[in-house]
Structures are given as C-alpha cells and as structure tokens.
A protein has these predicted regions:
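Well-ordered alpha-helical scaffold segments within catalytic/enzyme domains
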Residues: 270-281, 292-296, 329-342, 382, ...
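An extended acidic
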Residues: 1-81, 157-195, 260-286
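Polysaccharide-binding surfaces and accessory modules of carbohydrate-active proteins
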Residues: 1, 77-79, 83-194, 213-215, ...
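Non-catalytic C-terminal accessory modules of carbohydrate-active enzymes
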Residues: 30-31, 35, 40-41, 48-87, ...
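Beta-strand-rich interaction surfaces with strong enrichment in secreted/lumenal proteins
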Residues: 89-92, 203-206, 215-221
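Extended, well-ordered alpha-helical scaffold segments
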Residues: 243-264, 282-289, 339-356, 411-429, ...
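Extended glycan-interaction surfaces of carbohydrate-active proteins
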Residues: 71-73, 237, 271-322, 357-389, ...
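Short Pro-Gly-centered flexible turn/kink motifs
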Residues: 65, 114, 219-239
Length: 653
C-alpha cells in the first residue's frame, strides 16, 4: 500500500496508507522496529449505519490527503457516497513526547438523522516479531477512564479514544462505548476486527499471542450533523511513562499537543521558508513538503533512512529502512545548503562512530549504527579478495563534511572530526587508488556490479580535493599535499581513461580485467558534472549530456532511467527501463547550471506533477502509465527535488 503521509518526531514514525490507515509504526527509533511489519498488518477503521458496515479499505470510499501548511500534520478525507457519510482525520505525531494522535470528524451527508457506529482497530507485531507473545488488556482506570494496553516486556502502547462534546467554552469528553481484544493470524483467527461487523463488540478483556483490539462508539447524527472524536496511541519503553503520555493527551491536552506540534514544525521550517519564498508559487508548497519528508526520515542518531515504506515486504525479502551512506550524502546536502546545523552534525557523529578502523564506511547501517544486511561479497570468486563496500559511500561522507565546513566555517567542528573522520577516510581513499591512479574496483553506485566507475572516481576526486582544503585550515601541510596530489592524479587519469570518444559519453567504468564498460549510465555523467571531475567549460560534459538525452529520447519522455536496460522493478519487456525522479532531476540541475532555466523548469514541472497531494515522490515511475513503483516516499527523491530547487534559487539570485 502506497503511503499518503508520513508523520514523525524522530522517535516515533507513522506511515499512513492510501486509505489513511496506519500501516507502518516505527518506535523507538525512526526506521527501526516496525510494529506493524507492513504486509497486511494495518489498523482498520469501520463505520456501521443500520445494517450496512464498511471498512475504509473495502473500495467504497473516495480519499483525499494533504499536509497542513508548514507542519507535518496530515488531513485525510474519506467519503462514502453509498452510506452518505464523510470522515475527516487530522493526524500528527506529538513533537515532544511519543504519541500518535488523530482527530476524527464523522459527518452525516444525508438529509435525515442516522444512528452511527464508529470502530477503531489496532494490531501490532511488537518488536517487529511474531516469535514471542504480545499481551493486550482492557484498562479500567480511575475516574471512569478507559484504555487498551498492548505490550511486550517493557514496550507498551496505550490506546485511548474519546467522543468530544459540548461547545467552545465548555467541552466534554466521553470514552469509547464498546471494546474487545483478541487474536489474529493464529488458531484460525482473522482478528477481533471481525467482531465489529455485527455492531456489537464482545468485551473481551485480555489475550496474549498475536493480538489485536477494537474500540467502538455508538452515536446519533442529525441532518448534516457532525460528531468529533480524539484518538491516541501513547508509546514508551516503560509502562508508567506510557501511562504518563496517555494522561497528557486526555481531554484538553489533545488540542494543546496539536498546537505545540504545529509550532515546533514551523520553528524548524523557518530557514527553509525564507528560501521557499524565492521560488515560483507553484514550487513553494512541494519544496516544503519534500523537506519535511526528508526530516521525517532522520533517525534520532542522525542517520537518514532511505525509506520507511514497508510495502515492498509484500514482494521482497527486505525493505529500505536502513541508512545507506550513499543516500545520506544527498539527503543531508540540501539541509546544509539551507543552513541547518544540528542534523548534519548528528549524522557526522553517526559516521564517526560507524567508521571501520580501516577508515571506510560499510554498505549500509541500521538506524542505531549497527551494521545492516548486505549482498556485497568479500570475493569475486576463486582466490580473489576484496572489501564488500562502495567507495563512493566513504568518499561521499568526506565530501559532505567539507561542504558543512565550507558553509559554517566552524573550526571547533573541524577539530572534533578531523582526526576521527576526515583523516582516516582521506588516507583510505589515497591507499585505495590503483596503479592507474583511479580507485580500484568496488561495488558501484547502484549496488550491482564490481568495477571502478566514473561516478565513484568523481566522488573520490572531490572528497580528496575538499579534504586537502580542510587540512590546510588546520595547517596539516603533509596531509594537504598528499590528498591534493592524489586528487589531481585522479583527475588527470580520468581525463585520459574515462571518456569514450567513440560515443562521446563517459565509460561506465573499468572492470577488474581492464575492459571498459560503454553502457550509458546517467550517474557517469552526473558524477563527472556535480563533483567537477571534468571541467564544466569543456566540451566533453556537454557532448555527453546530449548523448544521454538522445539515448533516452527525452523529446518524447521527460523522465530518465538510471541506465540502459535497467530491469529493477521492470514488470514487462515491452519497455527498456523505469523512470527515476532522481536521474530526471539531474537533468534539471545541469540545465540550471547552463543557464537554460526554461528547460529546467519544464523538467521540474513534470517531476512536481508526479508528486502526490502530500508531496511524496517514489523511487521509480512506470513510463507507460506514470504509476509509482517501489517505495514511496524515497528520501533521496525528496532531497534531490529540494536540491534542484535550491539550484534554481541560486541561479536566479
């Protein structure tokens, strides 16, 4: 199920699916331990009127979604014309404590009064696992308050729901009328949600195993009348803290939490809003939405998570809830350009703590810094040995740190990270270059092949050249000379070895046997351009760009694929490859650099049109029908959109 909104405070991350239902539930860290596990494990919402019952996902509802202006607070409208009912959700994750909250309004669209029932269902696989039993209990609390507790060990989720009555001056709050708890996925049980369909919940008070629960409200609606409800899930790794958070949200605490969350986002967005005002009006909203989506994927450790969309678990063995240093470069870079200091600095601390003793980053990481799973082997077969790494990931971190220093000129930060991050990586990159002065074969940007690519060479060049400038700032003359000398050797060798005069494009790379790969790969051009491996004023970059556009027929299709014959998520042989927003935006960035703003805006407009109403961009787009493919949102796609618009602002200034 594609995501329509992401809500997060860095600890708690909620993904809402196309029906506005909770389908990803990460806690206590962004991207780590999804307690709904994707797949069919989502929280249901149902309405019963008379003899008719409808769950929101059953196909009878029409949906629209949007974010609040300048806050990661979503609004979803669901209309059922057959039932003549509308439900409006206002959803948010509280900014300063770990609660998912939603305001619910149920409106009668009929010109006659109705008796209505609202059912709110939740299920969890706590700690992302079915291996051990969860417990669910009905909680009868003091002062006639009621709640539902789901827990495993210390981890607790407390669910509360109230009907809101009264007027503006004196509101009243009434807890749910019905409840039940039960099992799903074992012993032939589908789930306690089935119990709601007859309108009467069985009031079961405890269960353990694979557990779920349902809350129910019974209420009347006059002609065109509405009823309001508030619902929350309070989360903690301590049962008492979960109760404390639950109490904070009771009664008037809900409105306060919504107000404070909105203020918190507006404060964080203040630097970005100043930039957005310099854009054409048509880009401003999408710019801010994309930036909020990037922020929503930053773990509390500082690690940018590639995507928290777990939909692909329906088809694949794993998801994207990891930190790839490759993606992190492009996620953090626009934050630096916008003037954000804290998030990049936390990420550099994450990198310093994750860096191997050899001075390189591994393939990918869990949000807490532990090593993530990898498909890169230590050997290419036979007696060969190699590191299971992508050299661009280590180089990218070094380049990014140099951009941070260039922006803020903070010598205390340079002192803090020089010996533990800058120098180890730079020395490793020098040692990793072969006799031809290019990086030795390694796993390339797209994580598939083992060779020395133009893209990786570009990042290593830029990283070493930037590192030499950092060394000069600290009067480390020996380091500065060593790193600059190697950078210049790389550039000279690249000029001789990596441009293919036969097709006027960059070689994708050089294989371990010395053979050169002529495949047209968008990253070869982009790396040479953005990391200044080839002179922007020279002919080769511009000739290569023309070849890239002609090869992928941009006159009839604005979007670019990654490379020729890309089969990843390609579901038919009747077309060559899917479109990637990332590579498409690279086209726009080059046009901006050339001063061809109208052409750049044509591309930016096309990418903007592919965004959802909440600004979400996927990893890939089917060129036949423009449907989103793979994960959505992809943090890199959102960040690249922000970066392209920042380029546009810079060009027009």
């Amino acid at each position: 199920m594609a995501k329509t909104a992401i809500l997060s405070n860095g600890n708690l991350n909620i993904g809402l699916n196309e029906f506005g239902l909770v389908s990803d539930f990460y806690f206590p860290d962004n991207g780590y331990e999804n307690h709904t596990l994707g797949r069919d494990l989502f929280h249901r919402i149902g309405i019963k009127i008379g003899d008719e019952f409808s769950w929101l996902q059953n196909g009878d509802w029409q949906f629209s979604s949007e974010y609040f202006e300048d806050a990661l607070i979503s609004k979803t409208e669901a209309i059922n014309n057959n039932l003549q009912i509308k439900i409006t959700f206002t959803d948010f994750v509280v900014s300063d404590f770990d609660v998912f909250a939603r305001k619910i309004r149920v409106q009668n669209l009929a010109n006659y009064p109705r008796e209505v029932q609202l059912f709110l269902h939740q299920n969890f696989a706590i700690n992302s696992s079915f291996h051990l039993a969860d417990t669910v209990q009905f909680l009868p609390l003091e002062d006639d308050e009621k709640a539902i507790l789901h827990y495993r060990g210390k981890r607790a989720f407390i669910i509360s729901a109230q009907k809101v009555g009264g007027d503006f001056n004196q509101k009243s709050f009434k807890d749910f009328d019905q409840h039940t708890v039960g099992l799903f996925g074992i012993e032939g049980k589908l789930g306690s949600w089935c119990d709601a369909e007859d309108g009467i919940l069985s009031s079961s008070n405890v269960e353990h195993g694979q557990t779920d629960s349902v809350l129910g409200f019974n209420f009347s609606l006059g002609v065109f009348e509405s009823a309001d409800f508030q619902y929350s899930i309070s989360c903690a790794d301590d049962h008492q803290l979960a109760l404390t958070n639950f109490q904070k949200m009771r009664d008037e605490g809900f409105s306060k939490a919504l107000s404070e969350t909105k203020k918190s986002w507006q404060k964080w967005l203040a630097p970005a809003l100043r930039f957005s005002k310099k854009l054409d009006l048509k880009y401003q909203k999408k710019f801010i939405q994309s930036l909020m989506l990037v922020k929503s994927h930053l773990a509390k450790t500082g690690a940018p998570i590639a995507s928290n969309d777990s939909e692909m678990l329906n088809y694949a063995r794993d998801d994207y809830s990891y930190c790839w240093p490759r993606d992190a470069l492009f996620a953090i870079w626009p934050l630096i350009r916008l003037g954000y200091r804290d998030e990049p600095q936390r990420f550099f601390t994450f990198c310093k703590n994750s860096l191997t003793p050899g001075g390189f980053m591994m393939h990918k990481y869990l949000p807490n810094g532990e090593l993530g799973p990898s498909w890169h082997p230590y050997s290419q077969g036979g007696e060969t040995r190699n590191l299971p790494i992508q050299i661009d990931e280590s180089a990218g971190i070094l380049f990014l740190f140099a951009q941070y220093y260039k922006k803020f000129r903070d010598n205390s930060i340079l002192d803090e990270f020089y010996d533990d991050l800058v120098k180890p990586i730079a020395d490793f990159l020098v040692d990793f270059c072969g006799e031809n002065n290019l990086p030795k074969p390694n796993y390339e940007l797209w994580e598939m092949d083992f060779l020395s690519t133009t893209y990786s060479t570009s990042v290593v060049f830029a990283a070493l050249y930037s590192a030499s400038n950092l060394a000069q700032q600290l009067n480390r003359a020996r380091d500065a000379k060593k790193w600059r000398d190697q950078a210049l050797k790389i550039r000279t060798s690249a000029q001789n070895e990596l441009f293919n005069p036969e097709n006027n494009y960059f070689y994708r790379g050089i294989w371990p046997n010395g053979e050169k790969d002529s495949k047209i790969d968008a990253s070869s051009f982009y790396g040479a351009f953005i990391f200044n491996l080839f002179d922007f004023k020279g002919e080769k970059l511009h000739r290569a760009f023309n070849v890239l556009e002609k090869r992928f027929n941009v006159d009839s299709q604005i979007g670019l694929p990654r490379f020729e014959s890309d089969v990843y998520y390609r579901f038919s042989d009747d077309y060559e490859a899917n479109i990637w927003p990332i590579t498409t935006l690279w086209r726009a960035e080059f046009y901006i650099a050339r001063g061809e703003i109208l052409k750049a805006k044509e591309i930016l407009d096309w990418v903007s049109d592919q965004q959802t109403s909440t600004g979400i961009l996927p990893e890939q787009i089917d060129p036949r029908d423009l449907k989103h493919l793979s994960v959505a949102p992809l943090t890199w796609s959102q960040a690249e959109y922000v970066s392209a618009l920042l380029d546009l602002i810079a060009s027009e200034e």
